[in-house]
Amino acid sequence: MDKLYAAIFGVFMGSQEDDLTDFIEIVKSVLSDEKTVTSTNNTGCWGWYWLIIIFFIVLILLLLIYLYLKVVW
């Protein structure tokens, strides 16, 4: 078992500290049978979705303004 621990932590020695922290949290949740795992990887996705949605809304508004001005003038 000591060799297993040494191998697991040896992998994370050259890695970022966040990776080790996430790994420890996952191991804790598995050992304690918790259903919630704190993960910071998915929080950035919602920002991209909102950015894409806002981009398309602005694009549609610009198209509608262009068509309106084309008809009025």
Curated annotation (Swiss-Prot):
A single cellular component GO annotation: virion membrane
Chief location bin: virion
InterPro entries: Poxvirus_I2
Membrane topology: Single-pass membrane protein
Leader sequence residues: none
Ranges that cross the membrane: 49-69
GO terms of biological process kind: symbiont entry into host cell
Keywords: Late protein, Membrane, Transmembrane, Transmembrane helix, Viral penetration into host cytoplasm, Virion, Virus entry into host cell
Cell location: Virion membrane
Pfam families xref list: Pox_EPC_I2-L1
Top-rank lineage group of the source organism: Viruses
Family: Belongs to the orthopoxvirus OPG078 family.
Role description: Late protein which probably plays a role in virus entry into the host cell.
Name the record gives this protein: Protein OPG078
Organism placement in taxonomy: Viruses, Varidnaviria, Bamfordvirae, Nucleocytoviricota, Pokkesviricetes
